[in-house]
Regions:
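Hydrophobic anchor at the start of a short beta-strand
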Residues: 35, 89-92, 170, 227, ...
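Solvent-exposed alpha-helices and their adjacent loops that cap or buttress functional pockets
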Residues: 27-32, 60-61, 113, 121-130, ...
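A conserved regulatory-domain signal marking ACT and ACT-like small-molecule sensing domains
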Residues: 56, 240-627
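YjeF_N-associated NAD(P)HX repair module
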Residues: 79, 164, 211-212, 221-255
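Nucleotide/pyrophosphate-binding catalytic subdomain
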Residues: 1-218, 316-318, 408, 587-591, ...
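Short, structured patches in soluble enzyme cores that scaffold and shape functional sites
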Residues: 135, 174, 205-208, 221, ...
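Phosphate/diphosphate-binding loops
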Residues: 199-233, 367, 418
């Protein structure tokens, strides 16, 4: 069996740790395995090298930085190879260039184009352990420049080698026992997850879980590389990351594959939007409690905040049994929806006199592009929006995730939208989803779909007031950000239309990394005059708390528990977005840690049979979720 083992900086942070890793590698070989080891720089070596560069230059070139930083891994691979040889195990150390990792020429953030495994395969056939420098490669073309893959690059190197060599297993060894349901440094009750899907892991990684780089998960998902995240301090089994059965694909352009693999259309959607004055704490929790009790299928959820601090919430409901041309079925009738929202707003005190401001649009559809690494590729969303605009399709709601970008549109133009997207992204065919394709869940007995909760304190919210509500506006806004290579996470389009000089407008808000907030604001201000929008507001005092899990929004009881947990802690929700695999809320930054603890306690299942010890976890019985 061919096994790739990757060891992070803390795992090889001292001579003693390197010797311990050598013992583990030798034992793996003795268990009748062939082994490739990918190693990071020792301890804080990379940080020390960065400090040295700053000491001699205020603005070092990206090329020289790659030349400098790549030396850190060369020290650790040579030492580990020596340690293996000392144990009588044949081993050889090779740089990324020497094993044939070919990248593009983007110094500091290179992407792998291909791996030429001939040399590494030669040594493996001789029974030699190959110790590879992670984080680095060599540019294509005639220059043969040393390149680095960016922070977390050793994860990427290991999984890419696993794909190129068709490894049976790729083990990622770290200083933690595996993937936890949340950050155990913030939430002591965090539990180790025994098993997680690639889709779930990709969302967790993109939301800030730092155990595994999102690009590494993306490669594993695309090529079906089996992954395990384990502690280098003990023999506990860690967390298995389950990859889907991979479709045959070329190893050329390994990290430069098409971002979009498919187009999905889902009809039979009803859009429900309501708005209110000042926020009433717990209203969203009550609303989804009512939805759960009536077992309605909710597809997307958004909430935004208006200029006058009023809030609106919109959601799409799947209309089961609805046939084109018929009126709404009883399950999602306009009257029923209004009753649900009224009950959530006013409860038992409602006397029938209060008017609920609500809009129900029956003939709606969702169109989505699917792939991997969507948020990390800022041009993808912009291209989708511009394609729809050119086809004359107006976007009413937007949902983003690492796996899918979804837009709510009028069903009358859905065929036009699908055709345009298939042509723009070179997709051969689209998938039409219907009510029968939606998994049914019992609110009483099915296990929680939630696998983890993540807190991100490094986001900023940018709000653009009074954007014209017409096709093409989202394309212009996010196209401008894509030109600046700024990735956008949450996107919320207000559902309350305001007319200025007779022109319908709405507010659009989105989140970016705090480090990109100033550049994003400047880029949009340069565009503001040409699109005649209003004020641009930047808020860095926010936190984003998210739940991740497959099919989560299809279980409204879980969504209700999420919102109820926040309401019980008196935490005000500023914004909400959802997708198939996650639901995210923006709250005040000072309430971020409290929010994470609340939603983890209220929404995460318990993992049994793991006992914490000072140096990690004792070898457990097979872990299970508590019922």
């Amino acid at each position: 069996m061919l096994i790739i083992q990757k060891y992070g900086g803390t795992s090889v942070g001292s001579v003693e740790r390197i010797k311990a890793v050598a013992q583990r590698v030798k034992q793996t070989v003795q268990n009748n395995n062939t082994v490739v080891v990918v190693v990071s720089a020792m301890g804080k070596t990379t940080d020390d090298l960065l400090s040295l560069s700053k000491a001699v230059s205020t603005n070092p070139s990206a090329r020289e930085m790659d030349m400098l930083l790549s030396t850190g891994e060369q020290v650790s691979i040579a030492l580990l190879s020596m340690a293996l040889q000392e144990l009588g195990q044949p081993a050889i150390s090779l740089t990324g260039a020497q094993v044939g990792i070919i990248t593009d020429a983007e110094h500091g953030r290179a992407r792998i184009l291909e791996i030429q495994p001939k040399r590494i395969q030669h040594y493996l056939n001789q029974g030699t352990v190959v110790v590879v420098a992670g984080f680095q490669g060599m540019s294509s073309g005639d220059n043969f420049e040393i390149t680095t893959l960016g922070r977390g690059g050793s994860d990427i190197s290991a999984v890419a080698l696993g794909a190129a060599l068709k490894a049976n297993l790729c083990e990622i060894y770290t200083d933690v026992p595996g993937i936890f349901t949340t950050d155990p440094r913030i939430v002591p009750e965090a539990q180790l997850i025994p098993e997680i899907t690639c889709d779930e892991m990709l969302e967790l990684a993109s939301l800030g879980a730092k155990v595994l780089h999102p690009r590494a998960v993306e490669i594993a998902r695309n090529y079906g590389v089996p992954l395990v995240v384990r502690s280098s301090w003990n023999n506990a089994p860690g967390t298995r990351i389950i990859s889907p059965i991979a479709k045959p694909r070329s190893l050329k352009g390994l990290e430069i594959n098409k971002a979009v693999y498919g187009v999905e259309l889902e009809t039979n959607q009803v859009k429900v939007a309501r708005w209110q004055g000042r926020d009433r704490l717990g209203v969203v929790a009550k609303l989804f409690g009512e939805i759960a009790r009536d077992n309605l299928d909710v597809n997307l959820i958004i909430q935004s905040i208006q200029e006058d601090d009023a809030k609106d919430i919109a959601l799409t409901v799947v209309n089961r049994g609805f046939e084109q041309g018929e009126t709404l079925g009883a399950a999602v009738s306009e009257t029923k929806l209004k009753e649900l929202i009224t009950s959530a707003l006013y409860g038992a005190t409602w006397q029938g006199s209060e008017e609920v401001e609500m809009m129900v649009e029956q003939n709606m559809a969702t169109v989505a592009i699917t792939g991997t690494g969507m948020i990390g590729r800022p041009g993808v969303a912009a291209k989708m929006f511009s394609t729809l605009a050119e086809a004359g399709v107006n976007i009413e709601m937007i949902s983003t995730s690492e796996l899918k970008i979804t837009c709510v549109i009028n069903a009358e133009v859905c065929d036009r939208a699908v055709a345009a997207l298939c042509q723009a992204f070179e997709i051969d065919r689209s998938v039409v989803l219907g009510p029968d394709s939606i998994q049914e869940f019992s609110t009483d007995s099915s296990p929680s779909p939630v696998c983890g909760a993540v807190l991100d304190l490094n986001q900023a919210c940018i709000t653009i007031r009074h954007v014209r509500d017409q096709p093409g506006m989202a394309a212009k806004l996010f196209g401008q950000l894509a030109q600046e290579n700024i990735s956008v996470d949450m996107i919320i389009q207000s559902q309350r239309c305001q007319r200025l000089n007779g022109i319908p407008t709405c507010d659009i808000a989105f989140t970016v990394a705090q480090a990109d907030a100033e550049a994003a604001s400047m880029a949009l201000k340069a565009l503001a005059l040409s699109i005649a929008c209003g004020e641009i507001i930047v808020d860095t005092d926010i936190a984003k708390v998210s739940l991740v899990g497959g099919g989560m929004v299809a279980q409204p009881l879980v969504v209700a528990q999420f919102f109820e947990a926040l309401a019980q802690q008196q935490i005000t929700i500023q914004m909400i977005t959802s997708s198939d695999t996650k639901i995210s809320c923006v709250v005040a930054q000072e309430e971020g840690v409290k929010a994470l603890n609340a939603v983890h306690k209220g929404s995460i299942p318990v993992v049994k049979n793991y006992a914490q010890t000072p140096k990690g976890l004792a070898t457990p019985a097979k872990p299970t979720y508590a019922g």
